Amino acid sequence: MAISQERKNEIIKEYRVHETDTGSPEVQIAVLTAEINAVNEHLRTHKKDHHSRRGLLKMVGRRRHLLNYLRSKDIQRYRELIKSLGIRR
């Protein structure tokens, strides 16, 4: 269910704002999106796994808050990010 450390590092390299960036909203949203997609795939086969479903809902809520924050701070970065991640909003 969880994404591997290698995959997480690839995502960080792709979405970071500067060389040592690991905590910008873009990076956090991209990592959360990858984790959400992994849990979503898990739930397709394990429909009764309600514990994972609750974790998924918490991740989606956290991503939504980060997206709202990014939209309020820089609308252009927000639009580029949702386009590159394929998030419909």
Curated annotation (Swiss-Prot):
<comment type="function">
    <text>Forms an intersubunit bridge (bridge B4) with the 23S rRNA of the 50S subunit in the ribosome.</text>
</comment>
<dbReference type="InterPro" id="IPR000589">
    <property type="entry name" value="Ribosomal_uS15"/>
</dbReference>
<dbReference type="GO" id="GO:0022627">
    <property type="term" value="C:cytosolic small ribosomal subunit"/>
</dbReference>
<dbReference type="GO" id="GO:0019843">
    <property type="term" value="F:rRNA binding"/>
</dbReference>
<dbReference type="GO" id="GO:0003735">
    <property type="term" value="F:structural constituent of ribosome"/>
</dbReference>
<dbReference type="GO" id="GO:0006412">
    <property type="term" value="P:translation"/>
</dbReference>
<keyword id="KW-0689">Ribosomal protein</keyword>
<keyword id="KW-0694">RNA-binding</keyword>
<dbReference type="InterPro" id="IPR009068">
    <property type="entry name" value="uS15_NS1_RNA-bd_sf"/>
</dbReference>
<comment type="subunit">
    <text>Part of the 30S ribosomal subunit. Forms a bridge to the 50S subunit in the 70S ribosome, contacting the 23S rRNA.</text>
</comment>
<comment type="similarity">
    <text>Belongs to the universal ribosomal protein uS15 family.</text>
</comment>
<protein>
    <recommendedName>
        <fullName>Small ribosomal subunit protein uS15</fullName>
    </recommendedName>
</protein>
<comment type="function">
    <text>One of the primary rRNA binding proteins, it binds directly to 16S rRNA where it helps nucleate assembly of the platform of the 30S subunit by binding and bridging several RNA helices of the 16S rRNA.</text>
</comment>
<keyword id="KW-0687">Ribonucleoprotein</keyword>
<dbReference type="Pfam" id="PF00312">
    <property type="entry name" value="Ribosomal_S15"/>
</dbReference>
<dbReference type="InterPro" id="IPR005290">
    <property type="entry name" value="Ribosomal_uS15_bac-type"/>
</dbReference>
<keyword id="KW-0699">rRNA-binding</keyword>
